[in-house]
UniProtKB/Swiss-Prot annotation:
One of its GO terms (molecular function) is protein-macromolecule adaptor activity. Homodimer. Enables the recognition and targeting of unfolded and aggregated proteins to the ClpC protease or to other proteins involved in proteolysis. Belongs to the MecA family. PANTHER family: ADAPTER PROTEIN MECA, ADAPTER PROTEIN MECA 1. It comes from the Bacteria. This is Adapter protein MecA. HAMAP family: MecA. The N-terminal domain probably binds unfolded/aggregated proteins; the C-terminal domain interacts with ClpC. The gene is mecA. InterPro entries: MecA_C_sf, Neg-reg_MecA. It comes from Streptococcus mutans serotype c (strain ATCC 700610 / UA159). Coiled coil: none annotated.
Length: 240
């Protein structure tokens, strides 16, 4: 289990499925009124050693979100009615027919009826921001590609030549293939020292004068005829 303090009033607790299993818990246990559910939450709080400002702070609001390999629990200080009773959960529909998401949505609605809806709305907003932040961090740490290659389609050789004459940017390599009655060109770009948007920008420029590729380079090597190797664009640009 891991705990992260998001703000003075909010914590995020990550509990793996292994943690649940080790303690004899299942997702459905959070909706079935029984003592071990309460005991589990008390145990988690004790193990994680809550920050001082959370100790003896009264009622806490929880937002539980199931993931593929864990559950995320967002906790915030709340004015939720202290009379909330787990026995109230016995009125739920047949939980055996519910997905984990349905389980926790139902639990959230019950908590709204009993207590502080504002606290739950705050948790939902915090969870959304955390998810967006995580996705942004994943994007920033994603390994940058050194090269990218595109395949372009042309109905005739004249359009291939016309396209070649529009290329005024650096190209690492290019090949020209013919397959059936159509022409196909592969274009390799070097992305080193280029901004993240460069590949998309160049592809958009190419599509102004070419069709989006319908064949892969591997397919063309096997089924097409390679007319020009390596420097197809340079050779085509020399045609008057």
């Amino acid at each position: 289990m891991e705990m992260k303090q998001i703000s003075e009033t909010t914590l995020k607790i990550t509990i793996s499925m292994e943690d649940l299993e080790e303690r004899g818990m299942e997702l459905k246990d959070f909706l079935i009124p029984q003592e071990k559910t309460e005991e589990f939450f008390y145990t988690v709080m004790d193990e994680l050693d809550l920050p001082e400002n959370f100790k003896d702070s009264g009622m806490l609001s929880f937002r539980v979100t199931p993931r593929n390999d864990r559950i995320d629990v967002f906790v915030t200080k709340s004015e939720i009615n202290k009379n909330l009773n787990l026995e109230d959960l016995s009125d739920f529909d047949d939980i055996s027919k519910m997905s984990p998401e349905d389980f926790f949505n139902t639990l959230e609605e019950t908590m709204r009826e009993k207590g502080d809806a504002a606290a739950l709305d705050k948790l939902a907003e915090i969870e959304k921001r955390e998810e967006e932040k995580t996705q942004q961090e994943k994007g920033e740490t994603k390994e940058k590609r050194d090269y990218v290659h595109f395949v372009l389609d042309f109905p005739n050789i004249q359009q291939v030549i016309n396209f070649a004459k529009t290329v005024d940017y650096d190209v690492e390599a290019s090949e020209l293939f013919k397959e059936s009655d159509a022409y196909h060109m592969t274009v390799l770009l070097n992305l080193e020292d280029k901004p993240d948007y460069y590949a998309d920008l160049m592809f958009a420029r190419m599509l102004e004068h070419a069709g989006r590729g319908t064949k892969t380079r591997a397919y063309l090597l096997e089924h097409g005829v390679q007319l020009i190797k390596a420097d197809a664009l340079q050779e085509l640009q020399m045609i008057g």
